From Swiss-Prot:
InterPro entries: Enolpyruvate_Tfrase_dom, Enolpyruvate_Tfrase_sf, EPSP_synthase, EPSP_synthase_CS, RNA3'P_cycl/enolpyr_Trfase_a/b. Phosphoenolpyruvate binds at K22, G96, R124, Q171, R344, R386, K411. Its main location: cytoplasm. Gene3D superfamilies: Enolpyruvate transferase domain. This is 3-phosphoshikimate 1-carboxyvinyltransferase. GO terms for cellular component: cytoplasm. Keywords: Amino-acid biosynthesis, Aromatic amino acid biosynthesis, Cytoplasm, Transferase. 3-phosphoshikimate binds at K22, S23, R27, S169, S170, Q171, S197, D313, N336, K340. The active site is at D313 (proton acceptor).
Length: 427
């Protein structure tokens, strides 16, 4: 297996221009494909997940052109639901941001299409979304294991009253919200259980509004969506930088700054993961906010005990930053780590112990006490981009670290290690 050994980093300093947000890129691509008119997306993320969405749109007859660096995309909207001319299978890798929204959108009208992906995708639950779509008339068949992809979709979603469980993934609600305006009837979506990752719903609502559709949000408990609507292209749309990707550089500065400035997001960003910077501030770093940047300057870091449900992806970065904080850090309400690219609670606990930390792994929390001195280890990454990026922070000590399968960062950030090297000074 390929590996990358990072030598100790004495200091980080500099500016990082963030790649486009994965969450925003894939939502914008789908809405542009469903909309009337031509949409030009700029600062689009070029990564595996986005390529899976683009390949699916091609198979569905959507025409688009990409710039040479794949960050500018001109899409000719379909002016309504997408149709596969003949029955076909779409392979979506391990891209939840493609699988969930497409599973809903392809239930409009009369399709016959199979959605499948990598082995890990077949372990990521989708039952709550399927249950909700079926309530609205969709005809969906599980082809292997009940409640998991691959799925056969045969259209039929017309709207109506739909209950959806929000306790596992906000992407199920996102998928329903984006699909419902194109259904023939009105849809009333009721949330069962606690809605996780609420800020990701705000991204969805914000983008839908950009494409001309507003819905009634009743305190995130119920959403009323008028049927028979259509999306309209906004013309040009700039994709924000990826706030989850920003977390690694901001944390690096908190640990070994200097100062690191990330551009492409700022105080008015629609991504909830910008709140990660508040957590670093609480730990003792200095944060400065601009309209188009966030900067972080080193501080003496102290442990925290916090509910991280609002920033589940960026919270992983706090787990490795905790290795550099004084005291025991507890991250709570993070059960949904278990249904991501890998079981991230298990993976994080296992790898933190390798570098010498004392770790308690609970059903929905993790507690981390750093060692006096970090140990050299080979870090398994579980084909999870965030594991690779999180554990790069171990090199900010006087101990090197080896990352196995470093190219797994291609899911969201193909040149992550080059960017980290650019702002790093060796120990």
């Amino acid at each position: 297996m390929e590996s990358l050994t990072l030598q100790p980093i004495a200091r980080v300093d500099g500016t990082i221009n963030l790649p486009g947000s994965k969450s925003v890129s894939n939502r914008a691509l789908l809405l542009a494909a469903l909309a009337h008119g031509k949409t030009v997306l700029t600062n689009l993320l070029d990564s595996d997940d986005v390529r899976h969405m683009l390949n699916a749109l091609t198979a569905l007859g959507v025409s688009y052109t990409l710039s040479a660096d794949r960050t500018r995309c001109e899409i000719i909207g379909n002016g309504g639901p997408l149709h596969a001319e003949s029955a076909r299978e779409l392979f979506l890798g391990n891209a939840g941001t493609a699988m969930r929204p497409l599973a809903a959108a392809l239930c409009l009208g009369s399709n016959d299409i199979v959605l499948t992906g990598e082995p890990r995708m077949k372990e990521r639950p989708i039952g709550h979304l399927v249950d909700a779509l079926r309530q609205g008339g969709a005809k969906i068949t599980y082809l292997e294991q009940e409640n998991y992809p691959p799925l056969r979709l045969q259209g039929g979603f017309t709207g109506g009253n739909v209950d959806v469980d929000g306790s596992v993934s906000s992407q199920f609600l996102t998928a329903l919200l984006m699909t419902a305006p194109l259904a023939p009837e009105d849809t009333v979506i009721r949330i069962k259980g606690d809605l996780v990752s609420k800020p990701y719903i705000d991204i969805t609502l914000n983008l839908m509004k950009t494409f001309g559709v507003e819905i009634e949000n009743q305190h995130y408990q119920q959403f009323v969506v008028k049927g028979g609507q259509s999306y309209q292209s906004p013309g040009t749309y700039l994709v924000e930088g990826d706030a989850s990707s920003a977390s690694y550089f901001l944390a690096a500065a908190a640990i070994r700054g200097g100062t690191v400035k990330v551009t492409g997001i700022g105080r008015n960003s629609m991504q909830g993961d910008i709140r990660f910077a508040d957590v670093l501030e609480k730990m003792g770093a200095t944060i400065c906010w601009g309209d188009d940047y966030i900067s972080c300057t080193r501080g003496e870091l102290n442990a925290i005990d916090m509910d991280m449900n609002h920033i589940p992806d960026a919270a992983m970065t706090i787990a490795t930053a905790a290795l550099f904080a004084k005291g025991t850090t507890t991250l709570r309400n993070i059960y949904n780590w278990r249904v991501k690219e890998t079981d991230r609670l298990f993976a994080m606990a296992t790898e933190l112990r390798k570098v010498g930390a004392e770790v308690e792994e609970g059903h929905d929390f993790i507690r981390i006490t750093p060692p006096e001195k970090l140990k050299f280890a080979e870090i398994a990454t579980y084909n999870d981009h965030r594991m690779a990026m999180c554990f790069s922070l171990v090199a900010l000590s006087d101990t090197p670290v080896t990352i196995l399968d470093p190219k797994c960062t291609a899911k969201t950030f193909p040149d992550y290690f080059e960017q980290l090297a650019r702002i790093s000074q060796p120990g």
